Curated annotation (Swiss-Prot):
Gene Ontology molecular function: transcription coregulator activity
Claim: Cytoplasm is one of the keywords in the record: no
Family label: Belongs to the Mediator complex subunit 14 family.
A Pfam family annotated for this UniProt entry: Med14
GO biological process, one term: regulation of transcription by RNA polymerase II
Keywords from the named record: Activator, Nucleus, Transcription, Transcription regulation
Subunit and partners: Component of the Mediator complex.
Gene encoding the protein: rgr1
Residue span of region Disordered: 1-61, 1035-1060
Basic and acidic residues bias locations: 41-61
Record-given protein name: Mediator of RNA polymerase II transcription subunit 14
Organism of this sequence: Neosartorya fischeri (strain ATCC 1020 / DSM 3700 / CBS 544.65 / FGSC A1164 / JCM 1740 / NRRL 181 / WB 181) (Aspergillus fischerianus)
Keyword match Transport: no
Top-rank lineage group of the source organism: Eukaryota
GO cellular component: core mediator complex; mediator complex
Length: 1093
């Protein structure tokens, strides 16, 4: 019944009272009465809630008609319809706006010309026109719908009358249906009465039978009642039947191949078809043309049941006899064979249904198509499906069937959507078990997956080389016993199995992995690739976790790859599944090592994040813009894997990781320099499995070094090639006190050198010489990751300089005492009782930015400079000229240098000893009487402060020999004792001669040995001066100095006493500049050193 839209005034009313204002009241008045829905107008007792009413007699004698049932089903308020339409309009408008927003409108390519009316046509692109059409269509459609609402609104105002019409129509239909039902019942009654009819009785035949006892009209068949059989007669007849059957089967009947197994007994023949049935047949006549008759059948498979008595047994009996009559034994076999095959399929179908409703619920899907049973297993597993089909297989040409051309039950296995051979499936046609069949199929499927995964894993180097082991345990009948054991690391193993019912892969690690690795086990796909991928991921996770836990013990810090993940992935191969970054406090900040793991192998990588000058100071700061400079694989294993039996394997690993960073940084630096030959190249740099850090072999040739790395020597020091050109740089661990990497450079000297090892102090660890050989070793320190190549070249050139100085000293017959890269100590003097130390200094090492290989190759000026110095320990008398000698060593002139310094040491030794003895005091309370001012190594000023006399002692050429010349520079003014001192000087020195010296009238000239006698004679002239001697005006404010009396045993020639030699004084050194050196141009340019005693 269609629904009616009612406005709020009429919804839900069951009946209506008479409305006198209704226009139809007067129109519907007939025969003096008015009826609305079966109620008479003016009836005061009408109950609107009653659906029907039995009429009562009225005053006029008429009965009131019963009230019609009021229909309210399907009525709903008009407001609900309006709300639905409005809501639908709003939703469609929102969808239209979204759709129009997705349409891209192309901009105006050019401004079009305005039409004659001056109005712009707007954007007339196809997209914009399409938008406008969509809006217009939407508006027209909604307008039409709301017009319909308007019509319904107007019509609903008259819904009261329509409701009455509906009630009337419902009444007419119900009466019509009652009429149809009455006709139907009458027809059925007429049909049923036919069976109740009884034929008229045959009274004549009845009277004849009752009177005569027989009916003459019936024919006599001549049957005689048979005699009762005795046991012997029955046995005789059975034997006869047996002979008839045997003769017939042997001579006449064509026996099908499956019926070749039979036995004749008890008057019947029993045909045995293995795995199917036993059939008993017998004959009804001796003729060979008579048919066999069915006696009994027994099924030979389980589960099976006998054919129940009744209709089914009768139908089978009749069907078999018909087949025997029409087709003989062959037709009978074909019928029974097909029946058995169908029965077996139905038995397996019922078992499959029971499994699908039991433990295998939601994992099996069973479908029977004619005589083909389809069982899909692992139904919830995504990807290609797997199922087994059991059906009747034609035996034509099949040698494995029970007979030529005999159908049999066949299996068709679809594994992951592809048909595979089903011969290995365990299926017993005599003992039907769907569960055993499924277990065999699933076991074969699981064995295939695990064996395929095992084959793929065995091809990887980790398993093919025996580093890790794997084992597959397979079973063709029991899927729960199939598993794959994989060794993840030395201490962790993984067992892979597949749940038989659902096909879900189960991964069980021993010991268990962390939670982040267990999330990978949520995948339910068990294809071979996914299975291998999951095993690979777990192996990599286990390897990285085990490595992290052990490496942290060694003091390494894990670096978060949060800001580097995208860039660092480009450094590693695509097959890397897991990696972890480590850093050690003894390394440079821009170097880390990365442990990468994949199913093909594990690797250690050295990664340089960025150049040293650009590295942040803290890894904790997340910098997502850190650029990677380089990365290099240093090993093909995690190194410690092959040393699991050693307890010290991981400490060795810590040593190896630091060595990897240190060696790679230096090889990378050499590779960038390009001008230095080295081995191994950067691409071949590897760490062996025995944790041996490779050494770097460097060809050392100063001439081929970049100009910036060639050491600049002083002009007086000649460069010599004293080292062989092959140097081996080796890593020797970490210095824990200095937190730096230790490098040792091994090399060999050119030519024989003796006693070098005795010259090097045992406390000096920077340089070692091989005893009895030409080998040497240099020790270098630097943080791991900072190259030591510049330091190495600087040390090698310094060593050559040191050996050159040592060779020169030995040529001058000086005795070397000690040797290092910073100094050479040697003994000199007639008795080798004096020692000097030649210091070897280098310029400050430039910053790391200046040492960048790119900048070094671009520079044309040198960065490294060597300076020499000389120092003397107390009481060496040459300490007065120490500064001057150092200036001569580093002078730019080729005439200066070590050769000149050794000559000066020999030439000035008597003078220096005399001055040292004179200026030495017995006690520190004794005042100075002589001031010695050193202008340079060959010019001295002698100042007697008490008397005010100044003398200059210089070198000069005299008679072709180098001599000393003493001259008086100035004299004090007239004062007490001045004339006596003048006279004493003239008498003692100027006009006198002595051992090795001669007076010149206004001075003294002396040879190398005689200058000491001159100094002693000069000092003797002033020894007797008194404390109240006249002092120069400029010295009045100075401290009083008491003179030391000359010992009585001191001779005029200058032989000092032991007491005088034992005196000690305080020396004050002042450095001034003076260019008055008269020895030669070289000496005149040296810096003057003034020593005041």
């Amino acid at each position: 019944m269609p629904g009616v839209i009612m406005d709020n005034a009429t919804v839900g009313r069951l009946g209506h009272a008479p409305d006198t204002q209704t226009p139809s009241n007067g129109d519907n008045l007939r025969n003096g009465s008015l009826h609305i829905n079966g109620a008479a107008k003016g009836d005061k007792d009408h109950d609107p809630d009653k659906e029907s009413y039995t009429g009562k007699p009225k005053i006029d004698g008429h009965r009131a008609l019963p009230e019609l049932p009021h229909i309210t089903q399907g009525f709903f308020p008009f407001s609900t319809l309006v709300n639905r339409y409005v809501q639908q309009c709003w939703n469609e408008l929102s969808d239209l706006i979204t759709e129009l927003a997705a349409i891209q409108v192309s901009p105006h390519s050019s401004m079009p010309l305005l039409p004659a009316n001056g109005k712009s046509p707007g954007n007339q692109s196809p997209e914009n026109v399409q938008k406008k059409l969509r809006i217009l269509d939407f508006a027209h459609a909604k307008r039409a719908e709301f017009i319909k609402l308007l019509v319904l609104s107007q019509w609903s105002r008259r819904a009261h009358d329509v409701s009455k019409l509906i009630d009337l129509q419902n009444f007419i239909r119900s009466r019509h249906q009652a009429f149809v039902d009455a006709l139907q019942r009458v027809g059925e009654m007429k049909r049923d009465l036919v069976q109740a009819q009884v034929a008229n009785p045959d009274l004549q035949t009845a009277l004849e039978i009752l009177s005569k006892g027989r009916l003459e009209s019936l024919a006599d068949l001549g049957y005689k009642s048979s005699k009762l059989l005795t046991a012997r007669g029955a046995l005789k007849r059975l034997h006869r039947i047996n002979r008839i059957i045997s003769a017939r089967l042997a001579l006449h009947d064509s026996i099908p191949h499956p019926f070749r197994t039979y036995r004749v007994h008890d008057g019947r023949v029993t045909f045995v078809v293995r795995g199917e049935f036993e059939l008993d047949l017998s004959v009804g006549a001796e003729s060979e043309l008579s048919q066999f008759f069915f006696v009994d059948i027994r099924f030979l498979y389980s589960p099976s049941s006998n054919i129940p008595n009744g209709r089914m047994s009768n139908e089978i009996d009749a069907k078999i006899n018909d087949k025997l009559r029409d087709s003989g034994l062959t037709g009978c076999f074909n019928f029974l064979h097909g029946l058995v095959l169908t029965n077996k399929i139905h038995i397996l179908f019922k078992q499959a249904i029971e499994l699908a409703k039991g433990l295998w619920s939601e994992t099996l899907r069973v479908e029977l198509l004619h005589r083909t049973l389809v069982i899909q297993y692992w139904a919830l597993k995504p990807g290609p499906k797997s199922w087994v089909e059991i059906g009747v297989k034609s035996g034509n040409g099949d040698a494995d069937s029970q007979g030529v051309g005999v159908p049999c039950l066949g299996l068709r296995w679809m594994r992951d959507g592809q048909e595979v051979d089903s011969r290995d499936i365990e299926f017993d046609p005599e003992d039907l078990s769907m569960e055993c069949l499924l277990r065999s199929v699933i076991a074969l499927h699981i064995s295939y997956l695990l064996s395929s995964a095992y084959g793929i894993l065995s091809e990887y180097s980790l398993f093919s080389t025996g580093t890790l082991s794997s084992q597959a345990i397979l079973n063709v009948t029991e899927p729960g016993e199939c598993q794959l054991s994989v060794q993840l690391t030395g201490s962790r193993h993984l067992r892979v199995s597949i749940e038989p019912m659902s096909g879900a892969v189960t991964l069980s690690a021993t010991p268990g992995l962390s939670e982040r690795s267990e999330s990978d086990a949520s995948l339910d796909r068990s294809t071979i690739d996914d299975l291998v991928a999951r095993v690979s991921r777990l192996r990599c996770i286990a390897a990285i976790e085990e490595l992290e836990s052990n490496v942290r013990i060694l003091g390494f810090e894990t670096v978060s790859p949060k800001g580097l993940r995208n860039e660092i992935r480009t450094v590693f191969p695509a097959n890397v599944l897991r990696f972890s970054l480590f850093w050690h406090p003894s390394w440079e900040r821009n170097w880390v090592v990365a442990a990468t793991s994949s199913i093909t192998g594990d690797n250690w990588w050295v990664v340089q994040l960025r150049r040293s000058s650009e590295v942040a100071t803290d890894f904790s700061v997340s910098d997502t813009s850190v650029p990677l400079c380089s990365g290099h694989s240093m090993s093909d294993t995690f190194l410690a894997t092959s040393h699991q039996t050693r307890s010290s394997s991981f400490p060795d690993l810590g040593y190896c990781l630091s060595g990897m960073v240190a060696i790679y940084a230096n090889v990378s630096y050499l590779s960038d320099l390009q001008s230095v030959e080295f081995h191994p190249p950067l691409c071949a740099l590897k760490v062996e499995s025995d944790l041996q850090i490779p050494d770097i072999f460097i060809r050392y040739q100063v001439s081929k070094l970049p100009r910036a790395l060639q050491l600049v020597l002083p002009a007086g020091l000649k460069r010599k090639n004293l080292l062989k050109d092959t140097v081996r740089l080796a890593f020797h661990g970490i210095d824990r006190h200095k937190n730096s990497a230790i490098f040792v450079a091994y090399g060999n000297l050119v030519g024989p050198w003796t006693d070098l090892c005795t010259l090097v102090s045992k406390s000096d660890s920077s340089l070692v010489f091989k005893r009895g050989g030409s080998g040497f070793a240099l020790r270098l320190l630097a943080p791991a990751g900072r190259p030591v190549i510049v330091q190495l070249f600087k040390s090698l050139q310094t060593l050559e300089c040191t050996l050159s100085i040592l060779d020169f000293l030995r040529q001058r017959r000086l005795t070397p005492q000690s040797l290092s890269l910073t100094h050479i100590a040697f003994a000199y003097g007639p008795r080798r009782d004096l020692s000097a130390i030649i210091g070897i200094g280098l310029s400050e090492v430039p910053s790391s930015a200046e040492l960048d290989p790119v900048r070094i190759l671009a520079r044309t000026d040198p960065l490294l400079f060597l300076t020499l110095g000389i120092r003397f320990k107390h009481p060496n008398p040459h300490r007065r000229v120490q500064g001057s000698l150092a200036a001569i060593l580093n002078h730019a002139s080729n005439e200066a240098g070590l050769d000149f310094v050794t000559e000066i040491l020999s030439f000035t030794l008597p003078l220096m000893r005399a001055l040292e003895q004179i200026t030495s005091n017995a006690s520190r309370q004794e005042s100075f009487r002589l001031q010695v001012i050193v202008r340079n190594a060959c010019t001295f000023l002698l100042h007697y402060t008490y008397q005010g006399f100044r003398f200059q002692l210089t070198t000069s050429q005299h008679s072709g020999q180098l001599t000393w010349v003493l001259r008086e520079l100035s004299s004090p003014g007239a004062g007490p004792g001045h004339d006596q001192l003048k006279a004493r000087l003239r008498g003692t020195l100027y006009h006198s001669n002595g051992n090795g010296w001669k007076g010149l009238g206004n001075g003294v000239v002396a040879d190398v040995e005689g200058v000491s006698n001159v100094i002693w004679a000069l000092d003797g002239c002033f020894t007797g001066a008194q404390h109240n001697t006249w002092l120069p005006r400029e010295t009045k404010s100075d401290q009083d100095y008491s003179t030391q009396p000359v010992p009585e045993k001191q001779s005029q020639t200058g032989a000092p006493s032991q007491a005088a030699m034992a005196n000690d004084t305080t020396i004050t050194a002042n450095f001034v500049n003076d260019k008055s050196l008269q020895r030669n141009p070289v000496a005149s340019n040296a810096a003057d050193v003034i020593t005041i005693d």
